[in-house]
Amino acid sequence: SLEYGKTINFVTELKVVFADGKEYAVKPLTKPQLVAKMSQGDYEGDLYKKLFNLVEKHYDEIKAAKPNVTKNSMGYYLWDVWDRNTGIFDLTKLIVGSQGTLGFVTDIKLRLVPTRPYTGLLVCFMKNIKPLGEVINKVLEHKPATFESFDDNTLYLSLRFLPSFRKYLGWWGLVKLLVSLIPDGLMLLKGIPKLILMVEFNGQTQEEVEQKINTLRDDLKPYGMAMERDETAAKSQKFWIMRRQSFNLLRSKVKDKHTAPFIDDLVVNPPYLPQFLPRLRKIIKKYKLQATIAGHMGDGNFHIIPLMKIEDPKEKAKLLPAMEEVDDLVLHYKGSLSGEHNDGLVRTPYVAKM
């Protein structure tokens, strides 16, 4: 999550079966411990020696290649394995996120954090995304638990297929959803926003959550956005349903098309989003892709999964040029082609570009 960061930051030790078939404990090592490990004269020692020599020899180049984003799952995390400043060599940084390609993880030790039981949401409706970079920076100053978003297409689909939410909510749940959306429906009569921002806060008390929401709302007033406070998890449910279920609804309603996740996990540093998002939408429109844009705004991580009739040669012909245009756009802003979903067959050919 935005508040806690990536799993990799909470892994303290692993047990891993490497290519020799033996299980090894993997954890951060000090420089003396690393030297001792490399001197063992066995498979494990040779592994550490080769990897250390590799990252030390190319240290500056590896550090310079790190994408300018808070999320990235392209390639291997070589830049976090060896830190000259601290003298720590941490092989867990390489194993986490490698998806079993370097070894089989059999045991994981994690650092835990206490939960905060109360949660609330501030929803912002942006008709003009020009000040988006400033808004994002202002929101991040308040250290929210999560910072999500979805676009006007997602909102439109949610409203269009609203009765179908009964499948997930039941009749009574659907009725409550419809009632809760009445104020939002009246607000939407004044115009559909280009982007809906969802800023979530957690706290030890309900009062703490409400104070955080109110403080952020006051700071965002100069941007002239319509805003809605949903101080409890129950009140904020309607927006989470739209954010999470609209694509599933679209997929279930369009019977002759299939999901095509080829530009589904891109990341761009949030300050660039006001320039990036309009250019991205132009590419989507150019290739006539039926797609919504939703994602993790605080990290600039977006999930775009078009519905396409892949068996149609004309549709299939769109895949490569559309992907290359989107990828080039992402890399123009020094982003990543995958924040969460790793490389796979689709993105592996583009690792070298990163």
Model-predicted segments: where are they?
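C-terminal substrate-recognition/cap domain of FAD-linked oxidoreductases
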Residues: 85-86, 92-321, 327-329, 333-336, ...
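FAD-binding subdomain of flavoenzyme oxidoreductases
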Residues: 1-141, 148
